[in-house]
Amino acid sequence: MQVSTAALAVLLCTMALCNQVLSAPLAADTPTACCFSYTSRQIPQNFIADYFETSSQCSKPSVIFLTKRGRQVCADPSEEWVQKYVSDLELSA
């Protein structure tokens, strides 16, 4: 009786651990940042330190500018000023 109780306890613990591992999202499949709206005005270019594009899994394609103060600003990639900033950042890299 004691052996079957111990075996059952081990089995339940193993199932609980496996369930947590299987239910955890995979890092590569989870977008790190998505934008749901864009900035309504152009940011001064000298405020921008870097940029990255959002994942294709996001509902809205976006460029996220990183400011020198550490803020993230969502911008519309179809805007001319956004394309110019991205191009300038690529050239300076």
Curated annotation (Swiss-Prot):
Signal sequence extent: 1-23
Keyword Chaperone in record: no
Name of the protein: C-C motif chemokine 3-like 1
Processing and modification events after translation: The N-terminal processed forms LD78-beta(3-70) and LD78-beta(5-70) are produced by proteolytic cleavage after secretion from peripheral blood monocytes. The cleavage to yield LD78-beta(3-70) is probably achieved by DPP4.
Alphabetical list of PROSITE patterns matching this protein: SMALL_CYTOKINES_CC (PS00472)
GO cellular component: extracellular region; extracellular space
Gene: CCL3L1
Coiled-coil region: none
Site residues by UniProt (Cleavage): P25, L26
Pfam families found in the cross-reference section: IL8 (PF00048)
Stored InterPro entries: Chemokine_b/g/d (IPR039809), Chemokine_CC_CS (IPR000827), Chemokine_IL8-like_dom (IPR001811), Interleukin_8-like_sf (IPR036048)
Keywords per UniProt: Chemotaxis, Cytokine, Disulfide bond, Secreted, Signal
Main localization of the protein described in the UniProt heading: secreted
A single GO BP: positive regulation of cell migration
